[in-house]
Design a protein with these regions (language model features):
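Active-site-adjacent bridging/hinge elements
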Residues: 40-47, 94-98, 204-210, 294-304
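Proline-rich low-complexity regions
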Residues: 74, 224-225, 293-303, 382
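Short, hydrophobic/aromatic alpha-helical segments in well-folded domains
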Residues: 69, 214-216, 228-231
C-alpha cells in the first residue's frame, strides 16, 4: 500500500527596489509667477528659483524576499498539503528628517530603517470518507505573520518604555489595570499614582512588583493576530451537497470605541442617546460596583509615566466565525423530464452568510474595522447576516 506518494521542496529568492518619495529626490527649478521688465519695458526677465534639491546619496528602498516551501501528498493523495515560510527584509527605508535652521527646505529625504516581515502559511487537504453515495472532504488553512523593526530611522525618538530590539511594527504600549478604586479607598495599593487616587479611577498594575509605578510597568502587545485559521468541509450524498466554512483570528485585542461614549464627565452635557455601557459606569451611590471608570477619571486629562495609556476599553477580540453554510441539490438530466431537451442540469441551493460568531468581545463585531486604525473600531456596523435562495441552470 502506498502510504507516501510524493513530496516537493522549493525556495524562492527575490530582490526589488522601491522609490516611494516620488520626484522629491530630484532637483528642479521653477519660474516665479511674476516677471521683471528692463530697458523701458522692452526686455522681460523671468526669475527662477530652486524648487527642490538633488539628493545623490539617497537610494531606493530595497526589499529582499525569501521563501521556502514544502508540498506533500500521502495515502494515495487522500492527504495532501503545503507549508511555506517567508521572511522579507526591507532596508534603506525612505523617510524625512528635519533640516537645519535657515535651510531653504524644512525637511530632506534620508535612508535608514530596516523592517523584517516574516511568517508561515500551511494548507492541509483531506479526503476523509469516500463510499458509493457519500463523500466528505476538508481543507484546513493556518497562517501567522509578523513584522519587527531591526533598525529604526536615525532620527527616531524613542519613548522611554519602547523596546529597542526587534520591536513589533504594530506594537501597542499600555499600563494594565485591575479594577477601580472603591469609595473608601480600601482596595487602593500604596503605589497608586496620585492622579489616579480618586474613587472610581482604575487601579494601575505594578507589573514588575517593585512597589512603584514607572515606565518599567508598561506592557506591550502586538496588534496583529497571532494566528489565522480556516476550516472548510464539503459533504456530498447522492444529489445533495453541503458546504460549511469556518474561520478565525486568535490572539488579538481591539479597542471597543463604545467605551468612549461612557465618559463620566460627558454625561452632564449629553442630549443624545448613550450606550447601554453607561449602566456599568462607577458611581459612589448609584453604582458602587461599576466596572467602567467614573466621573473622577478622564483618560485625556491625566497621564502616567512615559505618557503610555491604559488597557481601559481594550478587549480580547479573538473569534471563531461560521462564514457560510450552503445546502444544494443537483437535478440530473433523467430527473428533468421535458426540460432535459434544454438543460443538462439544475442545481438549487440555500445559503446563509455569517450565521454564527463565537467571541468574548462585547462590541458589535470583533473583526470589522471602520475607525482608521488597525483593529480599532468606531462603533462599527457588524457584518451582515444574509440568507439566499438560488438556482443554477446548465445548458
Amino acid at each position: 500500500r502506498d502510504y507516501y506518494a510524493s513530496r516537493g521542496l522549493g525556495d524562492v529568492y527575490k530582490r526589488q527596489g522601491n522609490d516611494n518619495l516620488g520626484s522629491s529626490l530630484h532637483g528642479s527649478y521653477d519660474a516665479f509667477g511674476t516677471h521683471v521688465m528692463f530697458n523701458e519695458n522692452s526686455v522681460k526677465y523671468i526669475p527662477y528659483y530652486l524648487k527642490s534639491q538633488d539628493y545623490p546619496d539617497v537610494t531606493w528602498e530595497k526589499t529582499v524576499m525569501k521563501n521556502i516551501g514544502l508540498d506533500f501528498s500521502l495515502l494515495n493523495d487522500r492527504v495532501n498539503g503545503s507549508f511555506d515560510y517567508f521572511w522579507n527584509d526591507i532596508t534603506d527605508m525612505l523617510g524625512y528628517a528635519n533640516s537645519n535652521g535657515l535651510s531653504m527646505f524644512g525637511s530632506y529625504p534620508i535612508n535608514g530603517a530596516h523592517i523584517r516581515r516574516y511568517g508561515w502559511d500551511a494548507t492541509l487537504n483531506t479526503v476523509n470518507v469516500t463510499t458509493k453515495d457519500f463523500k466528505w472532504t476538508s481543507v484546513l488553512t493556518l497562517s501567522h505573520t509578523n513584522a519587527i523593526w531591526k533598525e529604526r530611522m536615525p532620527n527616531h525618538t524613542y519613548n522611554e518604555y519602547q523596546i529597542r530590539k526587534d520591536e513589533p511594527v504594530n506594537a501597542r504600549y499600555y499600563y494594565r489595570t485591575n479594577g477601580l478604586v472603591n469609595l473608601d479607598k480600601s482596595n487602593m495599593p500604596s503605589y497608586q499614582p496620585e492622579a489616579y487616587q480618586k474613587p472610581g479611577c482604575p487601579i494601575i498594575v505594578d507589573l514588575n512588583g517593585d512597589g512603584l509605578i514607572t515606565v518599567e510597568d508598561v506592557d506591550m502587545k502586538n496588534v496583529i493576530p497571532s494566528l489565522y485559521w480556516g476550516f472548510g468541509n464539503t459533504f456530498t450524498y447522492k444529489n445533495w451537497d453541503l458546504d460549511v466554512f469556518i474561520y478565525s483570528q486568535l490572539g488579538v485585542d481591539k479597542y471597543n470605541d463604545v467605551y468612549s461614549w461612557t465618559s463620566g464627565r460627558g454625561l452632564g452635557n449629553q442630549t443624545n442617546n448613550m450606550s447601554v455601557y453607561i449602566k456599568d459606569v462607577w458611581h459612589s451611590e448609584l453604582n458602587p460596583n461599576g466596572t467602567i471608570p467614573g466621573i473622577a477619571y478622564e483618560m485625556a486629562s491625566v497621564s502616567l509615566p512615559g505618557g503610555a495609556g491604559t488597557d481601559i476599553g481594550y478587549e480580547n477580540s479573538s473569534f471563531v466565525r461560521v462564514r457560510n453554510i450552503t445546502l444544494g441539490y443537483n437535478f440530473k438530466p433523467n430527473q428533468l423530464g421535458a426540460l432535459s431537451k434544454l438543460l443538462s442540469g439544475i442545481r438549487v441551493y440555500v445559503d446563509v452568510q455569517n450565521p454564527f460568531t463565537f467571541t468574548g468581545y462585547t462590541g458589535l463585531d470583533p473583526e470589522v474595522n471602520t475607525g482608521g486604525n488597525y483593529k480599532g473600531g468606531k462603533a462599527e456596523y457588524p457584518q451582515t447576516r444574509t440568507f439566499s435562495l438560488g438556482a443554477k441552470l446548465s445548458f
